């Protein structure tokens, strides 16, 4: 049981720590929102999406989904469109004006964009299937539950912590220069993921 828990925690950390579109977006909204509670929608959405992907990976459902070419192509196309739009929305925001309410995205956009970088990112989905889904096959019964639950808990703690750190950075950035740089970097990372998806889509068609 203890081994399954440690395995789940380390595995989840290994997958979630690298700089990616999802992490960048959560951090960005933590920094941009005037109050921490303003970032709750993106935190909860990102964590819920990760929880869903982990469950699907452990249950083997996601593997079945990616064996359907038409569905895979549709996910790639929708994901590409969302990421391009999302990158543009973040790029054009102007936190340097010191009006963080203007720079921050609405709850609706936070939820929509968080879902797009989580559920419509083939790279993230394949990582979850290939690593967490495959690793879960080593366990059964209570150990499998502990392994799965541990990976989920790491996601929730990570996203709350990431947004909190972003909020502290945003509070310290009275001139708006750091937030401006964060927005530009965020948009570039998100567009980079979009290019990756576009290349994958090109190979499919």
Range-by-range predicted roles:
Residues 2-73, 130-146:
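Juxtamembrane transmembrane-helix termini in multi-pass membrane transport proteins
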Residues 55, 156-172:
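Transmembrane alpha-helical segments of integral membrane proteins
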Residues 12-16, 51, 118-122, 152-160:
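Residue-level hotspots within the lipid-embedded alpha helices of multi-pass solute transporters
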Residues 37-112, 165, 185:
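Membrane helix-loop-helix hairpins that form the core translocation module of multi-pass transporters
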Residues 33, 37, 171-179:
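Membrane-interface helix-boundary motifs at transmembrane edges
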């Amino acid at each position: 049981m203890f081994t399954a828990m440690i395995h789940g925690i380390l595995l989840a950390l290994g997958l979630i720590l690298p700089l990616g579109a999802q992490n960048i977006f959560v951090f960005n909204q933590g920094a941009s929102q005037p109050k921490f509670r303003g970032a709750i929608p993106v935190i909860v959405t990102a964590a819920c999406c990760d929880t869903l992907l982990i469950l699907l990976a452990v249950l083997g459902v996601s593997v079945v989904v990616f064996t359907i070419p038409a569905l895979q192509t549709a996910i790639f196309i929708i994901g590409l469109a969302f990421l391009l739009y999302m990158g543009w929305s973040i790029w054009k925001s102007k936190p340097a004006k010191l009006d963080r309410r203007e720079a921050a995205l609405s709850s609706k956009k936070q939820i929509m964009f968080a879902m797009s970088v989580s559920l419509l990112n083939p790279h993230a989905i394949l990582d979850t299937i290939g690593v967490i889904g495959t690793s879960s096959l080593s366990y059964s019964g209570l150990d499998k539950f502990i392994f799965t639950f541990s990976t989920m808990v790491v996601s929730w703690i990570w996203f709350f912590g990431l947004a909190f750190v972003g909020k502290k950075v945003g509070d310290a950035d009275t001139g708006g220069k750091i937030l401006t740089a964060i927005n530009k970097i965020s948009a570039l990372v998100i567009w980079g993921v979009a290019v990756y998806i576009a290349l994958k889509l090109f190979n499919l068609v």
